[in-house]
Amino acid sequence: MSILEKVQPIETMLPERYYTMSTEDMEKRVREIKEKMGETLFIPGHHYQKDEVVQFSDAAGDSLQLAQVAASNKKAKYIVFCGVHFMAETADMLTTDDQIVILPDMRAGCSMADMADIEQTERAWKELTKLFGDTMIPLTYVNSTAAIKAFCGRNGGATVTSSNAKQMVSWAFTQKERLVFLPDQHLGRNTTYDLGIPLDKMAVWDPYTDSLEYEGDIEEIQVILWKGHCSVHQNFTVKNIENVRKNQPDMNIIVHPECCYEVVAASDYAGSTKYIIDMIEAAPSGSKWAIGTEMNLVNRIIQQHPDKEIVSLNPFMCPCLTMNRIDLPHLLWALETIEKGEEINVISVDKQVTEEAVLALNRMLERV
């Protein structure tokens, strides 16, 4: 657990009785508590959540959308965030001090966010400054810890989403000659390449060996990518695309930019979760789509569009395992403890970290 968080769990593990309750009984109790608490309770649910959880969300969206919606809701005392840890952190930083953000299962982390910790990042910045001097600006994907957002805030940088990455990267290059992009190398590479920066002007910082990997002239490096990735989107391959092209050549292929450069380059379309949802929504009836993103979302899109032929780009894809930590039993547990006047798994980010992280968030929000 990060020292930047102050968590007050009543119990650290889900009580046994929730394992023996029927789905019907759990759903009934959630509805009862939601009705009883009314506007004092707000449940945001990420697109990648299970249907058993999403059915109770008061808003569905990507991580930043949900944090903003939570921040605009001044009536809710309790925000039970159905997503992963960094999302709940962002919600806590953007909401008021008297609003309480709860994560139903503290094990719901994000492997990509965990690939850049603050000690590694501070060390990397020091080493890169020796190489490049005061020519760099940091940008972090919102899929990062509060500490990394704060690092970017105090070093003149900002956050980005997969929807606005191009705008924010363009802005960053008006501030400095070089960009340090973390923690997702793939989103950084795909975005900067789309903006015209060649691959040989990009380097990768490996935080485990404290080394810079590059092929071109070091003096010409414009982008330094953190060696991190999404464990879900990493599993989509060019071979998957080749199989679809061979077996169903009339199928459109659309992927998330967290996929690697080779997969994005071989696809027909690439964009954020919202972009993918909107594209399928607007597509004509009878159209065919292979989607390269998280499986819970793909399955939901399939259910919502029976008039279209939709498959996962990778037929053996699994849902995001950490996102799947949030399930109906954990949601009910969180709600019942609130009902009893208790609080579990409260997310509370350190005040100074919040101030610096909000700087980075606001630099983005002011420009998009």
Swiss-Prot record:
Enzyme class: transferase
Names of required cofactors: [4Fe-4S] cluster
GO BP annotation list: 'de novo' NAD biosynthetic process from L-aspartate
Keywords noted in UniProt: 4Fe-4S, Cytoplasm, Iron, Iron-sulfur, Metal-binding, Pyridine nucleotide biosynthesis, Transferase
GO cellular component terms, A-Z: cytosol
Binding site for [4Fe-4S] cluster: C110, C230, C320
Family: Belongs to the quinolinate synthase family. Type 3 subfamily.
InterPro entries per the UniProt record, alphabetical: NadA (IPR003473), NadA_sf (IPR036094), Quinolinate_synth_A_type3 (IPR023515)
Pathway in which the depicted protein is active: Cofactor biosynthesis; NAD(+) biosynthesis; quinolinate from iminoaspartate: step 1/1
Main location, first listed in the record: cytoplasm
This protein's record includes keyword Aminoacyl-tRNA synthetase: no
Domain of life: Bacteria
Protein name per UniProt: Quinolinate synthase
Role noted for this protein: Catalyzes the condensation of iminoaspartate with dihydroxyacetone phosphate to form quinolinate.
Organism of this sequence: Bacillus cereus (strain ATCC 10987 / NRS 248)
Record gene name: nadA
Signal sequence annotation: none
Molecular function in Gene Ontology: 4 iron, 4 sulfur cluster binding; metal ion binding; quinolinate synthetase A activity
Catalytic activity: iminosuccinate + dihydroxyacetone phosphate = quinolinate + phosphate + 2 H2O + H(+)
Matches recorded under HAMAP family: NadA_type3
